[in-house]
Amino acid sequence: MLSVLFCSRVKGNPASNLPKLLDSAVKHTLPDERDKIEFLIKYDDDDDQRPPDSFFARYPFTIRRFVWSRGEGRHGLHHAQEYLFTQRDPRARFLLMTADDFYFTRTGFVSEILSVPDEFCIMGHNRPPIEAFAGIYEQESAIRQWNVAFGEMSPVVSVRLIEVCQNFGWQSNVDSWLMALSVVLYDMYKIVLWRALTPYYLREGGYGLGDTPTYNNMELTARKNPGNKYWFELLRRQARNVYLNIVHGTDLRPESFWSPHRLWWKLRSQPIHQLPLRAYRAALRGLPKAG
């Protein structure tokens, strides 16, 4: 299943066009895909122009709305996304992170996304030059390049990646965070999670620059780099968590006592000088007793 997550504000927002987004979803989803896509939308409680229930009832797929305070507006997008993530249908394998000024343009995108077997995956319209920023991604000039290398993106990200990373990057631009995480993953482990999809959406609004004052000194926008460089250390920790889950698996059930991985771990944990003696004792235990 595909969960589409976004925040919408009608009041004072001329770029908002939710009817066009949802109408395009009807046009470009097949009848047997409509139970495989859901929309989770957050509204501000002071937005008295948000659509009524009757507007949403006419659509042939699940649409769930949530309403709470505006807070810091756009700067709080990641907090809203984290909550919407926890409310998604538990069958969902992928998230589409979008906005209410996008609309769909190609039929079949739902089935195409859901056909991807990868447990850890990021999908966008293009494949940015991730490898080009290895070793230099913290430099100010490099940040200005990789931060816009993906274009106007409404990213698809696997649910498992968010479960392992535990958030959407400590700031409101999920596409910038996913690009940064991708660069760090390649820099540390030579792993690339990014896939390119044939374009299936367009945007009528524009970049949300997010340059109004905010408490968050880790905000990353088209014009501003993170003021708190600890953000990059947090990214490296996320990258390591992803790597360890890829290598060791994401199954939370305890391993069998006799599993190869557990036995190898126990073997490696022993001081090397004890191994010959332990092997000798094990061999003795296996010999038949005299008499």
PLM region spans:
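Conserved catalytic core of nucleotide-sugar-dependent glycosyltransferases
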Residues: 103-179
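Active-site-proximal specificity loops/subdomain of glycosyltransferases
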Residues: 45-91
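Short acidic, S/G/P-rich loop/turn micro-motifs used as interaction or catalytic elements
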Residues: 9-14, 46-48, 101-104, 129-130, ...
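Cell-envelope/extracellular polymer assembly enzymes that use nucleotide-activated donors
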Residues: 2-5, 38
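Short beta-strand/turn micro-motifs composed of small residues
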Residues: 6-8, 41-45, 98, 124
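C-terminal catalytic/acceptor-binding lobe
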Residues: 18, 169-291
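Short, well-formed alpha-helical segments that are part of the catalytic scaffolds
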Residues: 12-30
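Short beta-strand-to-loop acidic/aromatic patch adjacent to the donor-nucleotide binding site
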Residues: 92-103
